[in-house]
Design a protein with these regions (language model features):
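Cross-family detector of peptidyl-prolyl cis-trans isomerase
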Residues: 1-124
């Protein structure tokens, strides 16, 4: 399988979901990501309301590594990666309560934002 490339993120139309929503864009055929494992991912994050990118590991050319369930990633991102298989690409829509809530970690993310991530699982 060829190396993944940075995806374009298509924000779904309509109202932002109020629950964590995951949709496999590509189903991987490698190991499954489970709590306690260290996942290595590339991702793009945009806000649901504007579709504007607020963060991406692709531009840093450095995958993000985190322990599933370890508290290093926002809750919805962490939960959304669980169950992915290496080689997969998944859209994860994170409601505010599982994202940054009423806080704003950056001017690019207004308080109360629903977040949309497209995540490629590189390894566990």
């Amino acid at each position: 399988m060829s190396e993944p490339t940075k995806p374009e993120v298509d924000v779904p139309r309509g109202d932002a979901p109020t629950e964590l929503t995951v949709r496999d864009l590509v189903v991987g055929d490698g190991a499954e990501a489970k709590p306690g494992m260290v996942a290595r991912v590339h991702y793009v994050g945009v806000t649901f309301a504007s579709g504007k990118e607020f963060d991406t590991s692709w531009d840093r050319d450095q995958p993000f590594k985190f322990a599933l369930g370890g508290g290093r990633a926002v809750k919805g991102f962490d939960r959304g990666v669980r169950g992915m298989r290496v080689g997969g690409r998944r859209e994860i829509i994170v409601p505010p309560r599982l994202g940054y809530g009423k806080q704003s970690p950056s001017p690019l993310i207004p308080p109360g934002s629903t977040l949309v991530f497209v995540v490629d699982l590189l390894s566990v």
